[in-house]
Amino acid sequence: VLVATGCSRLIMFNTVVPKDEGARRIVRDAAYAPGPRGRIDLYTPTRPVGAGLRPVIVFLYGGSWNSGTKDGYGFVGRALAARGFLVAIPDYRLVPKVRYPAFVEDGAAAVRWVRAHAAEWGGDPARLVLVGHSAGAYNAAMLAYDPRWLGADRAAIKGFAGLAGPYDFDPFDGPIASAAFQGAGEARATQPVSHVAPGAPPALLATGDKDTTVRPANSDSLAARLTAVGTPATLRRYPAVGHVGILTAIAQPWRGRAPVLDDVAAFAARVTAEPGSPPGMRP
């Protein structure tokens, strides 16, 4: 279902790509859970927040559930923070040391930590948007739509933005998914589409029409299910963009390839807008 992206290549990419002005990392390696993978970074705009609190984005990266490090995604944190958000990027435990649902449980623990500490850094713990790419989009979708993981904290999730995510697939088909979901039991219970219910958070579901790693039909299926229960779901399909390209389009040199950053930032601003805010107002 998914193909891993080399951690070393992403770290190198993150190192050499131009950094967005107007944003900085303010927390590195804070512990949200025990162990070396239970660490989280925070990024914030450099401009003053004023009297209010900023909405918060929690970004979950992909990597087939078996690879990845937050150190390769600073370009995402800075890009979104420069748009006015407090951005959290956690690591999480990986296959083969763990299997489902451990990586979802880690995402839930990270969200709870963010809610407990966001205000210390100018973030609003009641206005969170979950954003994810690939396997991270799956993790984020499960947190957004399956109430088992966040419980009462799910009320703070105002929206979900998934980039090239798998939401409706056979978890026992193929070696990568099988390794991640071995022993999971009922297959449908592992799928985000199975947990959508009335009152679910709105979604932005973005894919590239050249994605051969995670089929765009996953996003179509989730959008249809959300629409059926009355939840707004926006589908974006970028021409000539592949599975990795939808992520790298967030970086400065490649933003002209697809308006991924603009779309995610506009969606997050809209779903977290406070009553009385002018339409389209950025955080």
Region roles according to the model:
Residues 8-51:
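N-terminal cap/lid segment of alpha/beta-hydrolase-fold proteins
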Residues 19, 35, 165-195, 201:
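Mobile cap/lid helix-loop segments that gate and shape the active-site cleft of serine hydrolases
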Residues 52-63:
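Short beta-strand element of the alpha/beta-hydrolase
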Residues 68-76, 83, 88-125, 252-255:
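Catalytic nucleophile-loop/oxyanion-hole region of alpha/beta-hydrolase
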Residues 109-175, 187-188:
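Primarily recognizes the serine-hydrolase "nucleophile elbow" in alpha/beta-hydrolase
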Residues 199, 205-207, 211:
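Short beta-strand/loop motif that positions the catalytic acidic residue
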Residues 212-220:
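Conserved alpha/beta-hydrolase "acid-adjacent" motif
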Residues 220, 227-283:
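C-terminal catalytic histidine-bearing segment of alpha/beta-hydrolase fold enzymes
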